[in-house]
Structure formats: C-alpha cells, structure tokens
C-alpha cells in the first residue's frame, strides 16, 4: 500500500553532497548521535547538530540528542552505552577516527546491537598521512562483525543509507555504511531524495520492540559483559551464525522495497553490461560510475564485457554473488581501493577467489585510487585489455606509473565523453573564492533548470 502511494508522488530533486545525503537520511532513524569530527566526515556531524538545534524531528517525533565527545573512542563508547540503554544511536567518522573505534566495534557486534556508522572512507596514515579517500580504514574493520554496506554516488548514498538503519534493527546486526571520502562525500549532485515518510514506514516495529526489550533496566536486570572461559566462549561465539546467515536476505528485501519506492534498482550485487559477457570487472564505491561508462563504450564496439558493483560486502553472500554473474563469464578482474601489505591479494579479491573456488573462471586482482588517485575510463579499458592478454598481470595497479615493481598497466588514449555533456575545469588560488563560486553555480543550475549538474572540488 505504501509503495503504491509513493509511486504516485512527485519526485523531490535537491542539490547536496554525499555527506548531507547520508546525514539527512540517517536523522529520522537516530535518537542519540555521539560525534567527534574528522575530515572528510565532519559535515555529517555538523549537519546533524544544526538540525537538532533547529528542532527537526526524527521518526519518533523527537529531536536527536547530540553529544560531542573528547575523541572518536569516546564517541563510539557513548554509542555503545546508548544502545545498551535501548536507544537507536548513530555516529560518523573516517580514517584514524575509525581506527580508535575498532575495539568497541567488536563489542557492539558481539552483543548484536543495531548501531550504524556512516563513514566517509579515507586513507589511514602509513608512511605519511593523507586526508583523501580510499578503503583502507573500512577494510581494517572487516573482522569486527559489523555489516559493511557500500555506496558509490550521492544518489546511492541517499537511497541506501536508510537500508543500513532498517536492516540493523531487523537483522539485529550493526552496520557500517561507507562511501568514498571527498569523491562522494564532497561531490555536489542533483539527487532524487527518497520520500522520508515512505522510507521510515519500512522500519520493523516488532524488531524495534525486541531491541528495546533487551535494554538494561533495573526492573528486569540481566548479566552482561562477562569474562568467559573456554568451556562456553567458543560455542557462544558460533551461536551468532544464524543472524549473519540471514542478514543478506534481510538487506536484499529492504533494497527491493527501496527500489520500489525510488524506481532505481538495487541489489547486494548490481550487474551492468552485456548479458553474455565473458570479461567482468568487480569493484565497489565511486569507481562504479567510471566502470559503467567504460563498459557502455566497449559494448558499443561489440566487446562482451560487464561490471559487477558490490553493495553488501559483509556478510559476503556467495548465493547472491554467484547469481549476479553472467553464466558466460570466463575472466574476472577485481579492483581493490586499498593496499594489503604482505598479503597474496587485497580483501575483495580474496573474497571473490574464495567464492569462485572450484570454477574454471580466471580471477586476477589489482589496486586503484589510493589517496583519491583519479581513475578514468581509459584505465578501466586497460584492465579489460589486461584480462584478455596472453599473460595477464596479476596484482596490477592503475592510475600510476610503477617504475619500481613494474605492476602498472599501460593505458591507451580513450575518449567516452557524451557529446551532450558540458565539462568545465576551474583553477583558483586560496582565498580567491573559486570553490565558493562553483558551489553556488552548480546549485543555481540544478535548482533553476532541468539540467543535472555535478561538481567536485
């Protein structure tokens, strides 16, 4: 009934960046937000604070209670405490801030509390610090027990951020929703904002009541946070398997409902390209739009290629993954936006290899986009060309010229620009106002014309 009403609604186009999209769609599901700002996630906390101060109501008719802590460790500790008391709690972070949260993430996941973290994923400092985006921070969390949900554009952030909250409550598993720092978090775009009432109506009230009933309460005290010995710890750790096994179907169901509301199709794994593709690239995040652009150009040339975008990375559902691939696929290249030093391959590559164990499909892996290194369609074409080479390079890189270990792929000139698209590049010095002027310009174009304008700084 809700879906029928929503389909008849007029689309609501707004201009915002990825941070605002995440914060806007998270606010209705949040009762307590504990924050500590860190680039590039800070605007999410700032917007939540501003909306709360102005009296914006969540789905329960309350303003969000927001507290800034002394550090990210304090923020996640406050989130943990709020969840134990039966309040839906959210925080926002990146990079080193997320690293400080990891010890508590294990506890929250082990206790199956429906926390939600929205992460503008960013490089973790190694030989040097960097404020720019890749997946190294998120990949450090993949063993915590948090579900990992990836989005690749401002529109996807707006559409799928609610799925993290909805599935966390119904599945009784905490979620970390991540999108690329700066490339998505700070990209301004024209988005069709999902109807808030329709989305919040999807919240499972019975699951919410069950969560509230588990809250610490002196009227019905419970024993928690015990120190266990080997006689019971192993068994109790395995006892959570059923919740993780069921979660992919919970997320897929919510994605189907969001798809019905928005008219945009979402799955755990979204395939794009030739239905009879023999060569497929697998990746997640903002590179997805670049990959689709390259696939369109190559399919138009008669090549049988495709792209598989990963949305739900943890739990990794082999059932949904295998069902998403064309039956004709022979070769796969997996792109990871991180560097796993000392490993035989990066995280997504290793998961794909495990999922395809026993099949004749050739799988190779590569790295791209560390510290927001740009990835263009020509580089994606180079990956497809490498796949069909007589001796393809495994463990390759794109976007750089590797003159040390010689793992970078050669890139040929490739133009795929839509002739109806206008692209402009502006240069300016600090304090000249170039960025501010472009912020205003793109909003004016989006809000006063039927055109779709995108800006990235």
Predicted ranges, named:
Residues 60-64, 175-270:
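Conformationally flexible catalytic loops at phosphate/diphosphate-handling active centers
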Residues 331-417:
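Peripheral docking tails and interdomain loops at the edges
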Residues 275-303, 316-321:
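Redox- and metal-dependent alpha/beta enzyme cores, enriched for Fe-S-associated oxidoreductases
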């Amino acid at each position: 009934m809700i879906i029928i009403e929503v389909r008849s609604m007029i689309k609501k186009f707004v201009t915002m960046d990825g941070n605002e999209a995440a914060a806007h769609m998270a606010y209705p599901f949040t009762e307590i937000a504990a924050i500590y700002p860190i680039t590039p996630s800070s605007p999410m906390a700032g917007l939540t604070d501003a909306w709360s101060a102005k009296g914006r109501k969540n789905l329960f008719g309350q303003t969000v209670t927001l507290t800034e802590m002394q550090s990210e460790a304090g923020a996640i500790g406050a989130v943990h405490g709020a969840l134990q008391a039966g309040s839906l709690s959210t925080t926002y972070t990146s990079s080193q801030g997320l690293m400080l949260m990891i010890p508590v993430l294990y506890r929250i996941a082990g206790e199956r509390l429906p926390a939600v973290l929205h992460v503008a994923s960013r490089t973790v400092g190694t030989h040097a610090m960097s404020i720019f985006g890749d997946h190294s921070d998120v990949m450090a969390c993949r063993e915590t027990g948090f579900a990992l949900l990836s989005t690749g554009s401002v529109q996807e952030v707006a559409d799928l951020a609610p799925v993290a909250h909805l599935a966390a409550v119904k599945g009784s598993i905490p979620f970390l929703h991540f999108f690329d720092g700066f490339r998505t978090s700070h990209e301004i775009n024209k988005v069709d904002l999902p109807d808030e009432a329709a989305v919040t109506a999807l919240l499972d009230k019975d699951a919410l009541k069950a969560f509230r009933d588990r809250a610490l309460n002196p009227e019905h005290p419970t024993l928690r946070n015990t120190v266990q010995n080997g006689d019971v710890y192993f068994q109790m750790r395995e006892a959570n398997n059923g919740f993780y096994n069921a979660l992919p179907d919970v997320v897929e169901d919510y994605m189907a409902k969001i798809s019905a509301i928005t008219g945009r199709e979402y799955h755990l794994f979204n395939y794009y390209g030739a239905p009879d593709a023999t060569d497929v690239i697998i990746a997640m995040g903002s590179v997805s739009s670049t990959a689709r652009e390259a696939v369109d150009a190559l399919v138009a040339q008669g090549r049988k290629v495709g792209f598989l975008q990963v949305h739900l990375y943890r739990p990794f559902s082999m059932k949904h993954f295998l069902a998403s691939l064309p039956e004709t696929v022979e070769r796969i290249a997996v792109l990871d936006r991180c560097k796993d030093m000392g490993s035989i391959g990066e995280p997504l590559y290793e998961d794909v290899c495990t999922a395809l164990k026993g099949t004749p499909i050739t799988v190779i892996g590569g790295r791209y986009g560390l510290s927001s290194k740009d990835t263009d369609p020509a580089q994606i074409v180079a990956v497809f060309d490498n796949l069909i080479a007589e001796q393809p390079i495994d463990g390759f890189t794109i976007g750089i010229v590797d003159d040390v270990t010689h793992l970078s792929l050669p890139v040929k000139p490739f133009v795929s620009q839509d002739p109806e698209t206008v692209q402009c590049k502006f240069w300016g010095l600090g304090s000249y106002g170039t960025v501010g002027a472009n912020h205003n310009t793109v909003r004016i174009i989006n809000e006063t014309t039927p055109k779709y304008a995108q800006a990235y700084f």
